[in-house]
């Protein structure tokens, strides 16, 4: 058995042979996967998942570990994830999706400090600010809103550990 990895991660490159490809281009990933006769493709980062890499690989008949483009929306949009949780009855922090600073300030008034401001777009884990400083929270919200289509999720602060899990499932149980 051998491991083929996307070039650019020195730790992974020590474990297998590295290839250069555009991880955001589903066709390029499929081309490289088929030329290497891979048995499984693992897609971890959010951006390639949102770009539909897992769908393209799966459509070509290669098993893939990673959610579909539709499922990746849960990571791509915090407001979408909040809506899915609400629709499914999953307990989560109270939150407001805001597209204007007036809405942000009203959410701050309603929820109080500490302020939790989450960029609604992909931010590679760097789109969240938790602070008791309202000016800092407002500054982050303003920066997120300044982009085309910008939105932020302002939510109640929950104290406790955060856990992220990657799991295998058989699709049935």
PLM regions and their residue ranges:
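Short, intrinsically disordered, charge-balanced linker/junction segments flanking boundaries
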Residues: 1, 169-173
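ATP-binding N-terminal substructure of ATP-dependent carboxylate-amine bond-forming enzymes
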Residues: 1-70
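Short acidic-hydrophobic, aromatic-tinged amphipathic segments that line or gate anion-handling sites
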Residues: 18-25, 96-100, 131
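Short beta->alpha connector loops
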Residues: 24, 46-48, 98-102, 158
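Short, well-ordered alpha-helical microsegments
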Residues: 49-51, 104, 162-163
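A conserved helix-loop-beta module that forms one wall/lid of the active-site cleft
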Residues: 67-127, 134
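Conserved ATP-binding module of the ATP-grasp superfamily
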Residues: 91-93, 110, 114-117, 130-168
